[in-house]
Each structure stands twice: as structure tokens, then as C-alpha cells.
Amino acid sequence: MDQLPLRERVTAPDVALPTGDGGVTWRAATEADIDAILDCEQEISAADHPHYMTIREELEEDFEHSYVDLARDTAVAFDADGRVLAWGLVLEPPGQETLVREILAGGVRPSERGRGLGRVLLQWQLARGTERLAASDRTLPGWLMTFVDK
């Protein structure tokens, strides 16, 4: 039995960047934000997986993929001083032979955990990933994937 395309099986939600509260401003990332995001990501790495640290080149590579639209596929939370508190990326890598997968990456600076930033970020990532699945003409399974370090 043939499956219908994902666009006929998945309903696209309304996707909007989170709104700020408590001095937090959300916006899409730009390449100019890489160093600020790296600072946040290195604190996350130190707390969650100290034997593996994200390096600048990895972030640059993620931001430069032809299949990443920074304006639509990223969300970053900043404090009033411009410090990154949380960041997220949704990417759909090529090679969709057996499934269409949306990978949800990012995290929350350890000192800012417990404020609800992660819940807001994940909600946005799930919506954006679902929106991307709903735009696919593929007749494959669709997955939203994320990874947890503990």
C-alpha cells in the first residue's frame, strides 16, 4: 500500500518565534551570532557532556548548510545585555531515502535552566519541524529527532 505524501498526512502548525518575557528577547540567528551562541553552547557542553565540546567550525557548518534557512530554522533567546541564554536549530539533512527527519538541536545555558526557556524553545522547534514535514512531497515516514546528553 502506498503512503500519501507527508504534506497530506501532517498538518502545518502556525509557527512564530517565542515572545520575550522576564527580560528575554527571541529572534532568529544570524551568522554574526555564532560567537555568542558558541559561548552558550560551550557552557552547555561543559555541564552536559564535558568530554565533547562543540567548536566554532561545527556551528559555522550548521549555519552554512544549503538546507538551513537561518531566518526560519533558528531561534535564539538573548538577555538585555545581548548574552545568549538559549538557542535552537531545526535542520532537515539530505539523504531522505527511508525517512524524512527534522533534527532539533540547541539548548539552554545551565545558569538559565528552570525558567521555562527550554520548554518554549522545544515548543518552537516541534512546530517548525512539523511545518517542514508538512511541506514535504515525500511518501516516507516523517520523524522529529533530538538528542539528550546526560
Language-model features and meaning:
Residues 2-63, 76-78, 83:
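Short amphipathic alpha-helix that is part of the acyltransferase structural core
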Residues 74-76, 82-92, 103:
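Conserved beta-strand in the GNAT
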Residues 65-69:
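Short loop/turn motifs at secondary-structure junctions and domain boundaries
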Residues 24, 73, 140-144:
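Residue-level recognition of the N-termini of beta-strands and the immediately preceding loop/turn
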Residues 114-131:
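Conserved acetyl-CoA-binding loop-helix of GNAT-fold acetyltransferases
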Residues 93-104, 113, 132, 136-141:
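A conserved beta-turn-beta hairpin within the catalytic core of GNAT-like acetyltransferases
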Residues 109-111:
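Active-site acidic-Proline motif in GNAT/NAT acetyltransferases
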Residues 146-150:
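Short, intrinsically disordered, charge-balanced linker/junction segments flanking boundaries
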